[in-house]
């Protein structure tokens, strides 16, 4: 047996493991066959008292682990015993004799022992994947973007906010790289100010996924959104092409956690799903190589949450879950990708889930993935659909509006609607499912939209005709609050975007506002206005149509509409707004829809020019120079150098302040004028003198050329190391450089030698010259007087 950690502290949990040196003849997999039983653990405390734990059953591998928390200082003694056991195998019996382990001592101190194992702190500079598995805690700033709307597969031209709760996100408009993926911007000539087709109406030329530092997006022709060229993969940090899947449309990525007796870790897949929702086919690819692995057929791909097609969700281990509401037969079904795979490829002995081994080229029957398919205990309207699904919260919401029989197929407003809440999980062996609650909503008008998620038990509904919000309890269905009209501008009717994050319902639309409402009482927390633009648009302001991204306490939102004219309006920006206060963090020119955020990087297509812009911190390079010749003590030294951006997008251009970053990037990348008043960054200068003393000698700010200088006078003679440091900013990583000087002691002053008398001839000539000069001066004065 073994105990860890040793030594331990009072109250600290230790792991007590025991292991028999033989295995059962009949043990199969993790749970099959006969396992050894009756293990006892005898514990002697420091005061001599005893306690016994057990009996325990071993795993198939003849060992097990239990936990124990010592309560007093001193030495504990542990000893394991096995009582012996008959194992009845096929055709014979085997007896395993009793045995007792050697005693193991555990020294317990007042405090836990520090074994010196630490993880690096969270990064402040930029970084790239892979992340070392030793860097515990980095999950707090790192995340992937597996679906087009983070954890929603579909990102239509509207209804597409997305919330990534873990990843860091850019705090400035600094561009890491840009890359054109299609023609964009003004063509010129006879076409005047007309721009190339943006694809914002339907095609959506850039709906990126991000997996392990790789961007994947589907390429469409500019002529038809249903047609597909293929899926392209690029490096998140450089824009470099990595692979291309010809003719394949990757719908989403998956990271699946496998955890069985022999396999532990994450596996990444790419999914291409096609066919009707009642009988879909998923083709699964390896995410690293893009090679085909296996195919799942006969999938019931539930409809709901997003109009147009089925909407999968992730389960707790990353499995793909698809809920289906069968209104024709009043049934509710859950399909689980992992169940289908486990059932198709069981461990030896027929135990699904004890190994993950889908064979290359295999075809899996998707019907094996039906986790449950149960009747609903009440009649369900045939038109009812699942409108809201939140697996983390454990609820789904079904909705249907009333229709009058005399106008079959049409709804007369105001109308009534029925809502039903169902659980996303039901108990194993359940033979039916009932709604958690059913509510009839009155006074329903056109354009009802739900929040994309549930938070703290609250979901919201938007009545566009009256421009008001309602908040409801998902546990009871009761209305908690409702607002007055949220806008006094008629364009507020066209509001599509609703997402709950950080305790607020966030919404944006055509009235030019991004607003936040407290989900506990519906009060307005803050609002952000995009500004007046007069006749530049038909709205007097800049609308939002396509939604927004939320990450790292910030909201990334752009100005756009469904089908912008070929002569695009001016003034659209990517706005980054503090999600808690509604204050602007930064903004940059561009019509930038449907971006994705991962690991502190934001990538998005700018419809103004057809280029992908990827924002985030980039590397910097600082240099420092000092005189190469010796310096005499008492003389001043000019220290100079430069600080340059090393990002691929603008390699070796000057670093500028965060406050001027947007204008600087617009100048470098968007044909805008140079911001002549832009400021540089602050450089710290330190020295190590001949005595080994380290001290600061001042700071300098770089200019628009990237250069800086500092005048300094050394205090003592000897060798100096000059260190120039840039601590980094929201835009750039830190960097430093060194230079060296030698300061010589000033020479000792000596008395001049006795002067040698000048020859008489020299004195004569000198005197004559002085006399002539005096005459010239006098003549000049006289001439001036005559004037």
Where in this protein do the model-derived segments appear?
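Sequence/structural signature of beta-propeller modules
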Residues: 106-182, 351, 359, 624-626, ...
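Secretory targeting signatures
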Residues: 18, 173, 290, 477, ...
């Amino acid at each position: 047996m073994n105990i860890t950690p040793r030594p331990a502290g009072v109250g600290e949990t230790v792991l007590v493991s025991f292991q028999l040196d033989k295995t059962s003849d009949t043990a199969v997999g993790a749970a099959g066959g006969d396992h050894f039983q009756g293990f006892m653990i005898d514990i002697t405390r420091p005061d001599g008292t005893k306690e016994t734990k057990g009996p325990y059953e071993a795993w198939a591998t003849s060992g097990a682990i239990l936990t124990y928390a010592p309560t007093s200082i001193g030495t504990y003694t542990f000893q394991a015993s096995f009582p012996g056991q008959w194992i009845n195998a096929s055709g014979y019996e085997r007896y395993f004799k009793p045995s007792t382990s050697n005693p193991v001592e555990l020294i317990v101190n007042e405090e836990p022992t520090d074994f010196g194992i630490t993880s690096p702190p969270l990064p402040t500079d930029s970084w790239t994947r892979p992340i070392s598995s030793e860097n515990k805690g980095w999950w707090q700033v790192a995340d992937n973007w597996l679906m087009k709307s983070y954890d929603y597969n579909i990102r239509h031209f509207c209804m597409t906010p997305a919330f990534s709760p873990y990843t860091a996100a850019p705090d400035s408009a600094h561009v890491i790289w840009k890359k054109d993926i299609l023609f964009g911007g003004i063509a010129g000539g006879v076409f005047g100010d007309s721009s190339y087709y943006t694809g914002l109406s339907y095609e959506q030329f850039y709906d990126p996924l991000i997996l392990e530092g790789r961007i994947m997006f589907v390429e469409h022709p500019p002529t038809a959104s249903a047609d597909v060229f293929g899926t392209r993969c690029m490096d998140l940090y450089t824009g470099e092409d990595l692979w291309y899947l010809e003719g394949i449309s990757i719908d989403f990525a998956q990271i699946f956690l496998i955890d069985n007796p022999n396999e532990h870790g994450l596996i990444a897949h790419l999914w291409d799903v096609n066919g009707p929702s009642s009988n879909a086919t998923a083709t699964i690819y390896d995410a690293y190589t893009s090679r085909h692995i296996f195919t799942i057929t006969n999938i019931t791909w539930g409809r709901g949450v997003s109009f147009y097609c089925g909407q999968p969700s992730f389960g707790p281990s990353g499995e793909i879950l698809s809920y289906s509401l069968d209104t024709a037969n009043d049934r509710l079904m859950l399909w689980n990708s992992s169940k289908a795979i486990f059932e198709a490829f069981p461990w030896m002995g027929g135990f699904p889930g004890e190994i993950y081994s889908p064979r290359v080229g295999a075809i899996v029957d998707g019907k094996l993935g039906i986790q449950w398919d149960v009747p609903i205990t009440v009649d369900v309207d045939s038109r009812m659909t699942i409108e809201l699904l939140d697996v983390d919260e454990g609820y789904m919401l079904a909705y249907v509006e009333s229709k009058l029989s005399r106008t079959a197929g049409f709804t007369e407003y105001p109308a009534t609607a029925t809502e039903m809440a169902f659980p996303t999980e039901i108990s194993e062996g359940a033979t039916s499912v009932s709604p958690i609650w059913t509510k009839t909503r009155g006074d329903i008008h056109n354009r009802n939209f739900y929040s994309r998620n549930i938070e703290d038990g609250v979901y919201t509904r938007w009545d566009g005709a009256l421009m008001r919000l309602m908040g409801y309890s998902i546990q009871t269905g009761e209305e908690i609050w409702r607002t007055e009209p949220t806008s006094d501008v008629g364009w507020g009717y066209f509001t599509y975007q609703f997402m709950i994050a950080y305790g607020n319902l966030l919404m944006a639309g055509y009235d030019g506002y991004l607003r936040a409402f407290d989900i506990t009482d519906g009060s307005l927390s803050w609002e952000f206005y995009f500004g007046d633009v007069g006749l530049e648009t038909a709205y007097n302001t800049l609308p939002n149509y396509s939604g927004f991204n939320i990450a790292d306490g910030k909201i990334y939102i752009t100005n756009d509409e469904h089908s912008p004219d070929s002569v695009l309006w001016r003034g659209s920006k990517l706005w980054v707004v503090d999600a808690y206060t509604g204050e602007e963090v930064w903004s940059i020119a561009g019509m930038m829809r449907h971006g994705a955020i991962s690991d502190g990087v934001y990538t998005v297509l700018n419809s103004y020019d057809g280029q992908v812009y990827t924002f985030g911190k980039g590397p910097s390079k600082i240099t420092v120079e000092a005189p190469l010749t010796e310096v005499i003590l008492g003389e001043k030294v000019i220290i100079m150098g430069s600080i340059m951006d090393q990002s691929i997008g603008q390699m070796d251009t000057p670093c500028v302040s965060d406050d001027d970053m947007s204008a600087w990037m617009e100048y470098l990348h968007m044909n805008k004028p140079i911001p002549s008043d832009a400021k540089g960054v602050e450089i710290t200068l330190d020295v190590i003198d001949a005595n080994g003393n380290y001290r600061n000698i001042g700071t300098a700010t770089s200019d628009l050329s990237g250069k800086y200088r500092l005048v300094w006078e050394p205090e003592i003679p000897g060798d100096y190391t000059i260190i120039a440091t840039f601590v980094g900013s929201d835009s750039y990583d830190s960097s430093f450089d060194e230079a060296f000087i030698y300061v010589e002691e000033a020479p000792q002053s000596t008395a001049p030698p006795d002067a040698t008398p000048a020859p008489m001839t020299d004195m004569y000539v000198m005197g004559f010259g002085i006399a002539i000069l005096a005459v010239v001066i006098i003549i000049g004065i006289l001439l001036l007087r005559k004037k």
